[in-house]
Amino acid sequence: MKPVLALWLIAFLPIVAANAQDGPAPPKISDIMAQQQRRHIKLWFAGHSGNWPLADYEIDELKDGFEDVNEQFGGDTVEKAVGAPIAAVEKAIEAKDRAAFTGAFDKLTAGCNSCHRLLDHSFIVIQRPTSLPYSDQSFATQK
């Protein structure tokens, strides 16, 4: 039994060591997109509540997530689908304009769905959030 264990260690230890040196695996696109969906929800409630600093934070986080997707998977599909809508959301946030925010947010959501269709994931349909899943976070502005 001991010789078998020794042979196993000799055979597989270099593989295990090599994998350990590579560092952690990058997140899967499904993990990034799950986080993007949470950011999308928070962005809506922040803008809808007029919490412009939080909305600004969430749109920046969304942009970072989309950059992660582009870095890992290449191409410019995401940029083509959501680049202009993100800019419109940023402009509405800067202007503190709820009506413009709502329209820009809806275009961003449509851009997300357009990207899903382009990547053969049309079964994933994002919409404007209808309820707040974060009962532990206030989206009201701090006075």
What is each stretch, according to the model?
Residues 1-4:
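Positively charged n-region of N-terminal signal peptides that target proteins for export
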Residues 6-15:
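Bacterial N-terminal signal peptides
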Residues 15-21:
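Sec/Tat signal peptide C-region and signal peptidase I cleavage site
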Residues 21-53, 58, 140-143:
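Immediate post-signal-peptide N-terminus of mature secreted/exported proteins
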Residues 48, 52-55, 82-108:
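Amphipathic, charged alpha-helical scaffolds that flank and support histidine-based chemistry
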Residues 108-119:
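The canonical Cys-X-X-Cys-His
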